[in-house]
Every structure is written in C-alpha cells, then in structure tokens.
Curated annotation (Swiss-Prot):
GO terms for cellular component: axon; cytoplasmic vesicle; extracellular space; membrane; neuron projection; synapse. Residues 489-625 form the P/Homo B domain. Ubiquitinated. Residues 23-107 form a propeptide. Its EC number is 3.4.21.94. Changing residue 594 to E: In n150; temperature-sensitive mutant. Loss of nlp and flp neuropeptide production. Egg-laying defects characterized by egg retention and resistance to serotonin and imipramine-induced egg-laying. The lineage of its organism: Eukaryota, Metazoa, Ecdysozoa, Nematoda, Chromadorea. Residues 1-22 form the signal peptide. It is found in: Cell projection, Axon; Cytoplasmic vesicle, Secretory vesicle lumen; Secreted. Serine endoprotease which cleaves preproteins at paired basic amino acids. Processes FMRFamide-like (flp) and neuropeptide-like protein (nlp) neuropeptides. Probably by processing flp-1 and flp-18, modulates the neuronal excitation-inhibition balance and thus the level of activity of the locomotor circuit. Regulates sensitivity to mechanosensory stimuli. By processing neuropeptides, modulates basal acetylcholine release at the ventral cord neuromuscular junctions. Probably by processing flp neuropeptides, regulates the turning step of male mating behavior. It catalyses: Release of protein hormones and neuropeptides from their precursors, generally by hydrolysis of -Lys-Arg-|- bonds. This is Neuroendocrine convertase 2. Disulfide bonds join 232-382, 324-354, 496-522. Pfam families: P_proprotein, Peptidase_S8, S8_pro-domain.
Amino acid sequence: MKNTHVDLICVFLSIFIGIGEAVDVYTNHFHVHLKEGGGLEDAHRIAKRHGFINRGQVAASDNEYHFVQPALVHARTRRSAGHHAKLHNDDEVLHVEQLKGYTRTKRGYRPLEQRLESQFDFSAVMSPSDPLYGYQWYLKNTGQAGGKARLDLNVERAWAMGFTGKNITTAIMDDGVDYMHPDIKNNFNAEASYDFSSNDPFPYPRYTDDWFNSHGTRCAGEIVAARDNGVCGVGVAYDGKVAGIRMLDQPYMTDLIEANSMGHEPSKIHIYSASWGPTDDGKTVDGPRNATMRAIVRGVNEGRNGLGSIFVWASGDGGEDDDCNCDGYAASMWTISINSAINNGENAHYDESCSSTLASTFSNGGRNPETGVATTDLYGRCTRSHSGTSAAAPEAAGVFALALEANPSLTWRDLQHLTVLTSSRNSLFDGRCRDFPSLGINDNHRDSHGNCSHFEWQMNGVGLEYNHLFGFGVLDAAEMVMLAMAWKTSPPRYHCTAGLIDTPHEIPADGNLILEINTDGCAGSQFEVRYLEHVQAVVSFNSTRRGDTTLYLISPMGTRTMILSRRPKDDDSKDGFTNWPFMTTHTWGENPTGKWRLVARFQGPGAHAGTLKKFELMLHGTREAPYNLIEPIVGQTNKKLDTVQKAHKRSH
C-alpha cells in the first residue's frame, strides 16, 4: 500500500542541503527546468540550439533535464556566466542552475597490506563447494581464524528453506560492476543497469593500476556470486540479480547524477545498495541535495509499484571520532543504515556510531588477513580483503533480497520493522574505552561499570534491546524470512509535528541545557502517532567548537539516545547546524505521549560557548498497533515480537 504524508517531510529536510564543500566547485553539468509542457524532444532541441548535450530527464521530475556543456572543463571555481545566460534567456526555459560539484567517498577500509523450519533437517544441509566459502565466516562461522562460532548471518538455514534471492534485483550504486566476471555474469540484470558517469548502458569499471575501481565489483559479488561453480565464494542471495549503476567515477559528484542513480528503473530494481557517502573525516556535515532527496522520496512512495524502493546505506568509516548522524544519507528515515562487526563480535576500529543505525552485519576481523570479506574482484579474480562498512551494506542487501523473495508484498517500512524484530544482540560488543560524561539525568540508561566506559546494550520502553553502535543487532536471515512469511502489512504511517522551541538558549560552559516538549502525539488529529518508528529532533545551533557539542534526546518512557556525539576533529565555529534532522530509531515501538527532553552540553578541553536556536520534535509512526495481526508460523516463535505485542496490549 502507498504510504501517506511522506512528501510532507521532504519540505523541511531539503532545508539542510546547503552544507557542502569548503570552496565552491562548478561543473559542466546544468539543471534545466523547462516551462510547462516542455518534453524530451523540446529539451533535445533547446540543448542543441545552445551547444549543450541533453542527458535526459531528471528522476522524480516532469519537465526537468540534465544538460552537459562539452566546451567547459569538468570543474572550475567560477560560474560560466555566458553559458548560463544562453539557457536563462531562452523563452522555453523556466529556470537553470549550473551544478556545484562535491565529494563522495567509497566506504572501504584499505588494509595495511595490500519454508517451515520443521520441514528441513538442517543437520544434513550441504554447504556450498565454492573454493573461498570456508573463508566466508560471516556466512557460516565455525570459529575459523579465531572467530566466535555461530556469529554469522544464519543464511544456510534461509537457503535450506528455499530462499536464495530468486526474482529480486539489487542495484550496486558505485564505480561500476565487472559484469563479465565468471561469478557474476549469469546473475547480471543488464536491463536495469546504467552508467551515469559515461552516459551509456554499460556500467563497466574503469581499470586503474591501483585497482581503485574494484569497489562495486566486490560489493556485487557479496550479493550474487554464483554457488557451486568453482569460482571465488558465494553470494548471500546467489540466485538473485544484480544491476550496475556506475556513478562514482568522475572528478566530482553532482545532484543530478545522484538523483538519476537513485531513481533509475524503480519498477525493475528492488534494492539499491550504497557503500559511499560524504567524506568520513570527522568534521564533514553533508547530505542529499534537492533533486536527490526528491528521488529518494519518490522511490519510497512509488518504487516497486507502490511498495517502495529499499535503500541500504553503509553507516560510515570515520571511526570513534565521527558520528553517522552527520551524514544525511545514512541518517535518513528512508534508508536502512548498516554498521559492521568483526569475527569475534567486536566493533571494527573504523565503525562510526549513531542513533540512526538500524542494524549490523560483518566486515574484516581485526588485523588477521584471513578475516577479510571474500568476494569477486577485477580481471575475473577473487579477493579475501574486501572490508569496511562498504562490505557490510551489500551483505544486508543480500539478506533483504531473501526476505523479499519470501514475501514480495513487503513495503519499505515492513522491511525496517522486520529488521528491528529479527536482528539479534548475539555476541556483539563495544571493545573500545570511551569518555562519557555523567549527565545527572533521571532516565532508564544503563551506564558502564569500572574504569572503562562502553556503548552498552540498552532496553527501550517496549523491551527492545539496542546499541548505539550496532542498532538492534546483527541481521539473522533465517529469522527474517520466517517472520516475513507471516507478516501483515504495516498500518498507515503518519507524521506528527510534536512541538517547537525557537527561542535562543545559551548552552552553559559546564553542565546541561535541557529543553522540554510535552506532546500528546497529535491525538485526535489526522496525524496522530501512538506507536513510534522514527523520531527526529530538528536542531539549529552554533558554538565555539561544533565538534565539542553533544546532544541527547530522552523519550517519555525514559529511553536516552545520544543524537550527536563528540567529534574532536570538527573545529567549526561558524556554520554550526541549521535545521539538521538528527534521527533516532532507539524509541521504536514506544508511545510518544508525554515529556521529551533535549539535553545539550559541551564535552572536551578548553572554553566553550554556544547558542541553541531551535528544537523541533518530529514523530513518525502509526496510529494502530503495528503487530497486532501478526501470528508467527506454528512452531516458530519470535521473542522480540512477543515482547512488543505484550507491551502494546498493556498500554492500549
């Protein structure tokens, strides 16, 4: 079913897109908006008249087009006033914009060295015979290479139930896919593929001496590498299809390249996997621009014939000095943000943490070369060293392909609900010592004991465990497909503006600034929310050092979420945050009625001063209890589902 009110959120989310490069870079790409009635042939004619090339219609638009001026260099520091004027003065053109370029980086850590379960007898399940399968510990962890046995994606049980990704296409938005690789070629969906870097239908990677453009091919193999063919390893959804969308391999990214990539063939592509984002340097704050945001919103509204496109995002490789809530892609409600763990359950040293991460999969384990991700590589070769959250996102996309095969009617929201309910704490833990201040706040947060603080596992108001690093835990393919088979479509989703404080408040140099909003969840209105999915705190502030400003959100049920952690490398004192939607999933399933508290404080050495200018609380969820009609398959229980169902009945 089509979800209501989604487009309303695009209005305020588009406010924050102006944050970009330190120095403006102008490309030879132009966004051209024709007057009403302007069609494709008109666009071709206008482009030719002024010496441009029309690359086609912009995704999620009716009369907007992507022009390229071949006479201009790819990037320059000044606008081209002459070329802009030609289009601007054309009587058939409503608006024209020369596009700025910006940076998007691949999220791959480079190593220092270069149906019913009772129907199956799982003890007799045959493992794949592919030569690298024994190294794919994240698919079947027997304790190899010092890992923890059974800490894996539990895919063999899902395969045994007959789910292998059949009829599901996942698009790899990256630097290209080697679709002639012997482990990929039979699972390549050419009709759903395109090269937006070169503007042709062949998304083949550009070879370089340093193998830099191997990223997309490696991600593709994680999902669809063929089984039992004697080549490399096996993909999570080895009977699925992969589409290549080449869009990273050019000097600068533009809004239209991103938008067209995310809006490409939404009726043929089920899942879009992205292992890239803004620079993971601990000081960048960036997110989708206007056209890209519109493409994502249209995707979740209209993709897959109204069920919604699935966007999977790598949470980021900035490590403990970064926060993925400063990445507008990973922190979006419309994407599923995936973090990683290594083979013993510990977080990887490059893992970022944030409250928008929904779940985790796996990536390379520590410094042991035997614990990388085994997958396909360029030149028809294999690799055992794929890594970073780049490797984690495709694993999740593969699991989601299995779930969509089990139940093709799942909406984009259904898949997020399934992720919350079937992900597992398993053996995941935070292996780093962290410096957490004592807030002195009365809530349900569980602090670490001893001299070393960690991101501990917490429990929200309806009994769901979550972790600031791992979200709701590691994906479990078998649990997900079993619950997917029994799933009932989620009730309609609504968006409640719960309150606004726009009077400036000074953040004290020591201690907390606490702002409170009391809400009834828009009770009695058409926007009433009684059962939460996503919560956003839309915040504006400036401070003497942006990276030393931390924010916490506490729900009426006592769940504490750190929506902005300290980023010691971020020394900004000018831009701050303007209408930035800090998102949390940690209050999933809770009743939002009551007092919400936003806590702002400084953390770090030196003198601090700052002003919090705005706090707006946005609640997203359902009026009806989302799980009331779901009954697990006979003989199969889901403890998390049972826990939340009981909590909802008690509060009804």
